[in-house]
């Protein structure tokens, strides 16, 4: 099979090294095929469904994927932990208070150090974790999102931080957490940059 050329769908195109006068290459092309999976490239990330083709789900296109004025940049992070631990962190609003605000000092804004009041909401396979903090004269509600099995979004860390009047703020990252083994996982994600208060009509009491 050295040097053989296959098409994206697994069909044999060329079999160099085989006798061109032999029937074997022709038979091989009709009976042998590599496994192949269709992919979707979107905003610098490649998505594949590796189950039975007839069960391929529709690609989920959430509103956060195409926001006017927001620039998305793909990135990858390797974690030396189980993938469930990463999902647990996104659904634990308290971790930002201690990890990013108290034990290691202020990493984002002072508002992160406040524990606040916690609420959790379940909508089918979607979960929301809300942390409502009082920051001086403001009330800041930060929401993190998990859609099973591995899609997460985190509330804004800078554009909306409880230090000024803001009625709406978009997520700071959009991320998929992929298990590698029991002790390692990879996050494939977009960092979201720009005016995260978009759309502006949300930034009013009426909106």
Stretches found by the model and what they are:
Residues 45-47, 53-207:
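C-terminal catalytic domain of Rieske-type non-heme iron oxygenases
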Residues 1-71:
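Rieske [2Fe-2S] iron-sulfur-binding domain
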């Amino acid at each position: 099979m050295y040097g053989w050329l296959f098409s994206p769908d697994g069909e044999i195109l060329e079999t160099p090294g085989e006798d061109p006068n032999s029937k074997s290459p022709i038979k091989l092309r009709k009976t042998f095929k590599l496994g192949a999976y269709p992919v979707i490239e979107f905003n610098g990330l490649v998505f594949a469904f590796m189950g039975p083709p007839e069960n391929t789900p529709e690609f989920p296109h959430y509103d956060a994927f195409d926001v006017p004025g927001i620039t998305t940049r793909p990135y990858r992070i390797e974690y030396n932990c189980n993938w469930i631990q990463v999902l647990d962190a996104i659904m634990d609003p308290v971790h930002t208070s201690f990890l990013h605000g108290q034990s290691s000092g202020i990493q984002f804004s002072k508002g992160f150090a406040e524990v606040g009041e916690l609420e959790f909401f379940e909508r089918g396979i979607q979960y929301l974790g809300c942390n409502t903090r009082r920051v001086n004269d403001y009330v800041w509600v930060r929401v993190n999102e998990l859609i099973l099995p591995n899609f997460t979004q985190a509330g804004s860390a800078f554009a909306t931080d409880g230090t000024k009047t803001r009625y709406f703020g978009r997520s700071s990252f959009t991320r998929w957490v992929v298990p590698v083994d029991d002790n390692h996982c990879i996050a494939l994600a977009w960092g979201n940059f720009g005016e995260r208060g978009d759309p502006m009509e949300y930034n009013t009491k009426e909106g």
